[in-house]
Amino acid sequence: MTNPKTDPEILAFFTPDAVQICESEAPVSEWPIRMWCRATGDHNPVYQDRDAARRYGHTDVFAPPGMMHAFTMPGLLDPTHDHLLSHLRRKLAEYGLNSTVMGKYEQEFITPIRLGDRLTREVRFESMSDEKATGIGIGHFIPLVEKIVNQNGEVIGNQRMEVLFFRPGTGKPMDPAAKPAKAAPAEVRPPGTVELPPLSIPLTTTLIIAGAVASNDYEPFHHDRDAAHAQGMKDIFMNVLTSCGFAARYATDWAGPAAVIKGHSTRLMASNFPGDMMTFTGTSEAPFQKGKETKINLRCTNSLGTHLQSVFTIV
């Protein structure tokens, strides 16, 4: 059998009964919030200072919304840990699909994450694409659909992740002699569009590892060069939670501490490797006003091209 889409054991992962429940190992507390903010350089006071949170119109401190994923990550576990995603990975590895990379990441934030909350994440696999040839490798896209709730049953948020499972070494190598693409024509922006000041951040090995640890992500290829090389990557690379954590910081640095992020839709492209520089730029459809929904279009680039493109919604 050469097509994983015809394997009954793999098809079983896409049935209504195939659900993974991931519970946070501990209540939400100040320390992981502080570690996340340090890793992403997010100095927004509403995440750690109760007086500041109330001064800016919030009822209390709350965790950065993107942490809803981090709090329910399995953390550093034995490789044989019984997790639905681990089972799927092992089955796909039988077909040579033993490398993964995130293609798209969408989050909707509904209820603030408070100190003391215990979060639970419900994970389902949506579907499996036909085989695709991408720049990084040949494989299949599999979306994961997830809901996060707190101990009271309140929905904290929803997220959807599109993951590429691919065969390492099957991508299209970059041609160093290739001519750079022609610059796109100048964008015509509607009246009232606000341009955000650029933000450039050096990419170091320490930063990439710190972000992965702060987001409770112990995928080896974010910390271990040998594991990254085995995946077909030139070095360790930044995980999606860190990338989106920086994007969220960029949005609220501009909008200010009164802003609340309600969600984002992000497409991931060129990886962030150590020794490079990432630069955020963006535009808003209008100046931010507290209580009024505003959309921010963000772009992050590095020397390889576009790292991510996002639309963030804030109120």
For each predicted feature, which ranges?
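Catalytic-pocket segment enriched in acidic/His residues
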Residues: 234-235, 242-287, 303
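Generic structural signal for residues positioned in beta-strands
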Residues: 67-68, 106, 160, 210, ...
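HotDog/MaoC-like acyl-thioester-processing domains
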Residues: 1-21, 102-200, 272-315
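A signal for specific C-terminal beta-sheet/loop modules enriched in small/flexible residues
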Residues: 95-97, 144, 256, 269, ...
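Hot-dog-fold acyl-thioester-processing enzymes
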Residues: 2-104, 170-258
